[in-house]
UniProtKB/Swiss-Prot annotation:
InterPro entries: Como_LCP, RNA2_polyprotein, Viral_coat. Keywords: Capsid protein, DNA-binding, GTP-binding, Host cell junction, Host-virus interaction, Inhibition of host innate immune response by virus, Nucleotide-binding, RNA-binding, Suppressor of RNA silencing, T=3 icosahedral capsid protein, Transport, Viral immunoevasion, Viral movement protein, Virion. SUPFAM superfamilies: Positive stranded ssRNA viruses (SSF88633). This is RNA2 polyprotein.
Length: 1009
């Protein structure tokens, strides 16, 4: 029977713990006993059955007496709902009106004869977290007898504690509000007589000396409106540590709004020494996003629930599997109620194996002082022997982390020797160990030295880590550029290989730059110049991955990769941080030299007013702390953000009240330039591959004239050929841009809501803008341009990126598509199998019977063709999107499908006597072996189709004809027998889905065929 009572008590206690109510249904006891216990007592089961019958009778009487109108209690809640639905239907209300008792009936229907339960605590009970004795006596003592509050000096080890609703204080809005998280009620702590560990004896050896804090629940009852926008952040700080990496335990973010309280559950798993200051061990740092609370009101009331277990010298806590495998791993959580978004993060600063190998541990054992005679009239106290044991590598940063041991010689190791001591002159008997390991034999004064006192392997001479440190320690070079007082726009101030900018230097990190193999930090270029505000100009610093031939350095091409355009009259200093290897996460100096990475400093717009003297622009180069991140573009994949860096143009507005309107096309796949040649960059070439596109356009507006010249510009999207004479232009959705005194730049965004459909990337230049159906970006002088000095109001417009980029179809391209400068996680849909023409070659017709052979070589990446001296070759190179991309993309990776069509003259099949051999090679050396060969002997020609996989050493990317890693390119060598019959060769190309590009190469203008 005692065993049965103990089981009933455990059921009673478990239900009270799980459901937080004061009464326990007998059905729960019976079901729990019958299901969970395999050998029930029949008498006990009969007793529970009778008790259950009485319980049902009591519940029925409770329901009957609760309702004042017994007629409403019709069998069940379903009948009640049906009754009310029939009584208060919409038709009845429209005819008879709403009864006065409708709200009461609705309240009864909502309650359904069940009283709402209060909001319960979420902290687990201590008996769920700690194992404890399950004897009947201890169970009755814990549950049936109300436990009194015990002072901590009488608390025994192994005892569990549960403190509810410990008051903490109130929280006021603002930053850095600190609250102590009490672990025990303060009145218990102050009445405790704390004893020291060393004073423990047999009588009080089981007395609690520490408290293991298993769980803390912080409850915040907010006094704010439930619909307010106040958001709060909380840091749980352990003040036993000084290092923030160890002190900050958890971070919580939640809305501080009224309604249900904020409940933060913490599982510190921390042993706290019982001491007068133990309640100040944990602190909660709170801050709010705004202080929208009146001064006379508090933000919230805070209270704490704690569960833990006492620890003594002889007894410790035993965690349950729930605590060890679930709660400790979870570390903490914050309750997320409906329509509340919360966030929690937990810090982990545990030492890794590599960090442990870098630690230095030193052990020093000093002997007692002994009186030693110096001379007959003088004696002093000295240490006869000392022991020093050191573990760890070099304390300096960058050590290899190997463990080393240095041990002094002990007198006990060699009876005839003693450790050599060097006493300093101060007489404080401190021993210097500069000659540890030097042994003096007792019979003489001969010195003996060990042979391997220094381990060369520990010097870390093979350290390959990247450059790091402060800006001074990582300073690579300084460049000084003179700006003439007569400087005009479109002037290149200095351009050169990036390696040339960096190598001529005596700065601290110059040698490290040249001798380091792998550098993972970005390059940071800081440009500074002082320009008076009554003048102004526009300067640009630009980085590109490569340069070919007599490349054009127009701002359209140079600013397409990594660049910044600024007005030094508004911004005295700017910085450009970039990754010189867009395909990888590291680089080095030789890489910059052999890939021909290019850097340019140029003037976009000249002086507004002429300065009295020349000026100096200073560039300082550093290794930035931010790591290099690859930046590549996949042709067939969607891009959440497409970094286009498209220079849209320079807009000039004369001073005065006259209306001035500028137009910039958004069909941006046609490049820039004139009618006979175009300029192209890599991002624009990628755009031109697609037939149609749309997205969110982000423009950067830069002021290029003096800050003293003022104007307000309205930007809007419109179709057709709009002129200044048209009225109501600002009826379009528009954005007004008005620069402050020292503001040099701003950004504006036009989302997809401005555009009904997508539009073409390229438009024929012969099509009137009124009929092209493509949007344009217009800039209208809103009020007037005016100043106290002469000069126009000049701004530069640059399309930074296209967000939520969507593209449709593949574009074969146009010759002479509309160019720049006409003025007064999205889905990619691509049509595969669409080819772009690359080039067409017609053989020379001057061949004779004696010279019946011709050959030519074509570079597949650069689209350059060279023929032999047989005669005049007719060569046509098409500026198609794929051909342009292969030229301007510095790094390429993936598969290209080529189609070579060989056409013959119209001769009889019996008269056909021509053939062609085609070799695919990657080097023009006569020792290079072909990768593939074809022979065509069919009458009147034929065609071949082949896939070419571009794969290189830089994370799979290849740079054509680069000295770095001896990278070559791909050629077609075509030898023709009887070129009078084989007359025409055409090459088409199609990019496959895995094709990727990175970086921009500066090229000469591309001639239109």
């Amino acid at each position: 029977m005692w065993h049965f009572c103990e089981q009933v008590y455990e059921c009673f206690e478990g239900y009270h713990r799980d459901y937080s109510v004061q009464t326990v249904p007998v059905e729960y006891l019976a079901s729990h006993y019958i299901v969970n216990k395999f050998r029930p007592d029949p008498l006990a089961v009969l007793w529970l059955f009778c008790l259950g019958i009485w319980w049902e009778i009591i519940q029925i009487l409770h329901h009957l007496f609760q309702y004042k109108e017994p007629a409403l209690f019709v069998g069940s809640c379903q009948n009640l709902a049906a009754f009310l639905e029939k009584k208060y239907s919409m038709e009845v209300i429209q005819k008879e009106g709403l009864a006065a008792s409708a709200l009461k009936d609705k309240e009864r229907l909502t309650e359904k004869a069940v009283v709402n339960q209060p909001l319960s605590n979420l902290i687990p009970h201590s008996n769920k977290m700690y194992e404890r004795s399950k004897s009947l006596l201890s169970g009755l003592k814990r549950g049936l007898i109300k436990q009194k509050e015990i002072a901590f000096d009488k608390l025994m080890g192994g005892s569990t504690i549960d403190f509810q609703h410990i008051p903490t204080g109130t929280l006021t809005p603002g930053e850095n509000k600190v609250l102590d998280i009490p672990i025990v009620p303060q009145h218990l702590l102050t009445s405790t007589n704390i004893t020291d560990y060393h004073q423990a004896n047999k009588k009080n050896a089981n007395g609690a000396t520490a408290l293991h804090v298993g769980a803390i629940e912080v409850i915040m009852d907010c006094f704010t409106s439930p619909d307010s926008n106040i958001c709060g952040g909380m840091l749980l700080v352990d003040t036993a540590h000084l290092n923030p990496d160890n002190a900050i335990r958890s971070v919580f973010v939640a809305p501080f709004i009224g309604g249900r309280p904020i409940r933060v559950l913490l599982f510190p798993d921390t042993l706290v020494e019982i001491a007068p200051n133990m309640n100040s061990r944990f602190k909660l740092l709170c801050t709010t996003s705004n202080g929208d609370v009146a001064p006379d009101f508090n933000l919230a009331m805070v209270k704490v629930n704690v569960a833990g277990c006492a620890v003594s010298l002889t007894r410790t806590y035993t965690p349950t599997a729930y605590l060890e495998q679930e709660l400790i791993k979870e570390k903490g959580a914050i309750v997320q109620y409906l329509n509340r978004h919360t966030f929690s993060m937990h810090r982990n600063n545990q030492m890794t194996k590599e960090e442990m190998q870098k630690q230095r541990l030193s052990f020093r054992l000093e002997s007692a002082l002994t009186l030693q005679e110096k001379h007959p009239l003088h004696a002093t106290f000295c240490k006869s022997t000392n022991f020093v044991y050191k573990i760890g590598g070099d304390a300096k940063e960058g050590s290899n982390g190997n463990l080393t041991v240095n041990e002094s010689q002990l007198s006990s190791h060699s009876p005839s020797a003693h450790v050599l001591h060097k006493h300093n002159n101060s007489g404080d008997n401190e021993v210097e160990f500069s000659e540890i390991g030097v042994v003096v034999p007792g019979a003489g004064r001969t010195k003996a030295y060990g042979q391997n006192e220094l381990d060369l392997a520990q010097l870390s001479l093979d350290d390959t880590s990247s450059l790091r440190g402060t800006a001074l320690q990582t300073k690579l070079a300084t460049s000084r550029i003179i700006l003439s007082k007569t400087m005009v726009g479109n002037t290149v101030l200095r351009e050169d290989l990036l390696a040339t900018f960096l190598q001529d230097s005596n700065e601290r990190a110059a040698i490290d730059l040249i001798r380091t193999h792998v550098i993972r930090g970005k390059i940071r270029c800081v440009a500074s110049i002082n320009v008076p505000e009554n003048t102004g100009c526009a300067l640009a610093i630009c980085f590109n991955s490569g340069i070919t031939g007599a490349a054009d350095t127009d701002i359209y091409t140079t600013s397409s990769q990594d660049a910044i355009v600024w007005n030094p009259a508004c911004e005295k200093a700017v910085e450009l941080t970039f990754n010189p290897n867009p395909c990888g996460d590291a680089w080095n100096f030789v890489f910059l030299q052999q890939t021909k990475a290019h850097f340019a400093v140029q003037c976009v717009t000249g002086w507004t007013t002429t300065p009295l003297t020349d000026l100096a622009l200073v560039l300082t180069w550093h290794i930035d702390r931010s790591l290099c991140v690859p930046k590549t573009l996949t042709i067939s994949s969607a891009h959440a953000s497409f970094p286009i860096n498209r220079w849209m143009g320079k807009l000039s507005f004369p001073q005065g009240p006259a209306r001035v309107l500028k137009r910039m096309p958004l069909a941006i796949g046609g490049g820039a330039g004139t009618k006979d040649a175009i300029l192209m960059n890599m991002p624009n070439a990628v755009i031109s591959l697609h037939r149609y596109f749309r997205g969110d356009f982000v423009f950067e507006i830069t002021k290029m004239s003096s800050p003293y010249i003022k104007a307000t510009i309205a930007f809007f999207i419109a179709f057709g050929d709009i002129t200044e004479e048209m009225t109501n232009l600002e009826s379009f959705p528009h954005k007004l841009v008005q620069f402050a005194e020292i503001q040099g730049r701003t950004t504006i965004t036009f989302t997809q809501s401005e555009f009904l459909t997508a539009w073409s990337t390229q438009v024929l230049s012969t099509v009137n803008p009124q009929k092209d159906g493509c949007p344009h970006l217009y800039a209208l002088l809103h009020d007037s341009a005016t100043s106290t000095i002469e000069g126009n109001f000049v701004i530069g417009v640059k399309l930074l990126d296209i967000r939520n980029y969507r593209a449709y179809g593949h574009n074969p391209g146009f010759e002479g598509a509309r160019l720049l400068g006409i003025s007064g996680q999205s889905t990619m849909v691509q049509q595969l199998g669409t080819y772009n023409p690359i080039w067409m070659v017609r053989t020379p017709l001057e061949s004779t019977a004696q010279q019946n052979f011709a050959s030519f070589t074509a570079d597949l990446m650069e689209s350059t063709i060279s023929g032999d001296s047989t005669g005049n070759w007719n060569i046509t190179v098409y500026p198609s999107p794929i051909a342009n991309l292969l030229k301007v993309a510095a790094w390429k990776k993936g598969t290209i499908r080529f189609q070579l069509i060989c056409r013959g003259a119209a001769v009889k099949q019996s008269d056909w006597a021509a053939s062609a051999r085609i070799d695919l090679i990657n080097n023009l050396s006569n020792k290079a072996l072909p990768a593939r060969s074809w022979y065509i002997t069919k009458p009147r020609g034929g065609d071949i189709e082949f896939d070419l996989e571009i794969a290189g050493p830089n994370n799979g990317f290849e740079m054509a004809n680069s000295s770095w890693a001896f990278q070559t390119t791909w050629y077609l060598e075509i030898a023709i027998d009887n070129p009078k019959q084989f007359t025409l060769f055409e090459l088409n190309a199609c990019l496959m889905e895995d094709f990727e590009v990175a970086g921009n190469t500066l090229n000469p203008p591309i001639l239109l065929s």
